[in-house]
Amino acid sequence: MTITKLTRTDLAPDLEAYQALFAQAELSHPAPSLSGDLQPRLFYGLEQLLYTPAVSSFMLVKAPEEPEYLQWLAAETRTLHEPAAPLYGVRYEVTDAQVTLAPAQGAEDNFASTAPVVMADWVEAEQLFGCVRQFNGAITLQPGLVHQANGGVLVLSLRTLLAQPLLWVRLKNMVTRQRFDWLSMDESRPLPVSIPSMPLSLKIILVGERESLADFQEMEPELAAQAIYSEYEDTLQFADADTLKAWCQWVWQNAQQLALPGPAADAWPLLIDEGTRYTGDQETLPLSPLWITRQLREAAAFCEGEEITGEAMQTMLARRVWREGYLAERMQDEILQEQILIETEGECVGQINALSVIEFPGHPRAFGEPSRISCVVHIGDGEFIDVERKAELGGNIHAKGMMIMQAFLMSELELEQQLPFTASLTFEQSYSEVDGDSASMAELCALISALANVPINQSIAITGSVDQFGRVQPVGGLNEKNEGFFTICQQRGLTGKQGVIIPAANVRHLSLSHELRQAVADNQFAIWAIDDITEALPMLTQLMWDGEGQTLRQTIQERIAQATQQETRHRFPWPLRWLGGTSSN
C-alpha cells in the first residue's frame, strides 16, 4: 500500500529554492527577446508569414479575441517586420469628377501606407475598405485599414469576419489578387465616378478562439488548410530557475507597459501561488495578459511605494475572496445550520462525504462543498439503482462511472451469478443535475460499506474516480474541494482526525490556502494521497479489502452466501418446506 500523508510543502508550489531569484534587480529589466522566448511557436509562424516569399498570405492564430491579445500580437509583429524599401500605396487625384491614379511619392500621399502593422478587433465595411463621399458635387476618397497596412500586415479578429461573411469574401479576393477594387457598399447605388483599382500587397493575421477557428475552417476549408497556423500559449511549464525568471520578467514587462508597480521579492510567492491556482498545476504558470493585468491593478490599489509588497498582495487576495465569497458563505451556512445534513464526526453505514465543485453562471468564483452520498442495500435481483439517473438528474459521464464501479465490484467478488442484493445509490439533498465521474470512488466506498454492513468514518471526505481495476484516477477542482470540506470542519471545530483522501496524481494540482496549509502543519487536518481504492477502504472502515483476517471482501462474500441460502430455501412452496422440515426429524 502506498498511502501518502501530505506535508505542508506538498500543498503548494515549493519556492524555497527561488528566494534569491526573487530579489534580483534584473527581473525588472526584461530582454527584448523575452516574448519570442515565451512564445517560440508563434514567433516561428510570424517569421514564416513575414519572410519573402511568404509561405502564405494568411495566418491563423488561436488566441482569445480580446483587444489585449490583438494589441500584443500587433506589437510583436511590428518588431519582426522589416519595412520594405519601396513606398507602398498610391495618390488619388480628383479633378472635374474624374479620378486618376499615380504612384505614391511620399508618406503624406492620401493612399500611401501609414503603418507596417494595423490591428482592429472589430471592423465595419467603410472602416476596412474606405469609402467614397460626395458632398455638393465634390468627391473625396477616404482610405481604409487595408490601405493603411498596404505592404504590411493587418491583424483582425475572426469573429468580426464570421459575423460579416461578405466582408471576408471581398477581403480574401483583394489579398489573393493583390488588387484593391472600389465597390459600392450599396448595390442599389453605384459609385458616382469610376475609380481605378490600386495594387495591394497585404498579409492577414486572423485571431480566434477554437470555436471561431472551427467555424472558419468549415467556411473556408482550403484556405484554412493552406494558411500558417500557430497558437498563443497561455501557460508556461517551469521546472528550473531560468524559466521562472523569464516568467517574472514577463510580469514586470506587463507592469511597465501598464505603468503599474511590479512585485517586490516577498510578493512573488503569493503571486505564483495564485497563478498555479489559476492554471490548476504547481508547475504551470499563466501567460494571460488579462490575468496578470487584473492581479497588478488590484494589488496596486493597496500599494504605497514603487513596488507591490507581499503585504499588499496578501491584502488584495484576501479582500477578493471576501468580496466574491457571499454565495459560498451562504451555502456553508446551510450545512452549519443543518439544513443540509453533512456529518464530520462519527460513523455511518453506507454513507460517505464526497466533494463537489459548485459553479454558478455569472459568478466569478467556483467553490467546493461536501455532498452526502448514501447507499441502501436489500435482498433483490442484483440491480444497481442510480437514483440520479432514474430521476433524470444524472449525466452520461456519471452513468459511465456507475457502470465502471459495478464492473470492478463484480470482478473482485468473482461472482458466478448476479448479487442477491439490490443497491440504491444517491446524492442526498441534490436537486440539480449531477454529472462527472469524480465521485465514483466515493460511491464505490459507500456501496462496499452497505454490502459489508461496515460503517464509514464521517471525519474523512474523499474525491477521485476509479477504473475497472480499482486504480484511482485524477479529477478536477482539488483546491476548491479540499478547502470546502476544511471550512466546514473548521467552523465546527477541528479535531485532528478530519481530512480528505485524494488521488496521488492530483497532488501536483494543489495550491491551497495558507490557513489550510497551517492546519496540516499543526496536525489539525490531513490530506492523504492514494493510488488504489483498496488503500482508501482501511482509512474509512478500519478493515482491509482483502488479505489475512477479517476483510471487507470476506464479509461481503459471507453475506452473499447467507442471502443465497435464504433465497434457495424460500424458493420452495411452504407445504414442501413443511414436509421437508418434518421428514428431517
Residue ranges of predicted features:
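Peripheral, non-AAA+ core regions of ATP-driven protein-machinery
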Residues: 1-3, 10-24, 43-49, 139, ...
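Conserved ASCE/P-loop NTPase catalytic core
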Residues: 1-217, 230-239, 249-311, 316-371, ...
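Short, surface-exposed amphipathic charged segments that create phosphate/polyanion-binding patches used
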Residues: 98-109, 245-247, 537-548
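A short helix-to-beta-strand connector/capping loop
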Residues: 200, 225, 521-525
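Conserved P-loop NTPase motor cores
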Residues: 210, 227-236, 430, 466-471
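Short regulatory helix/loop adjacent to the ATP-binding pocket of P-loop NTPases
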Residues: 212-226, 513-519
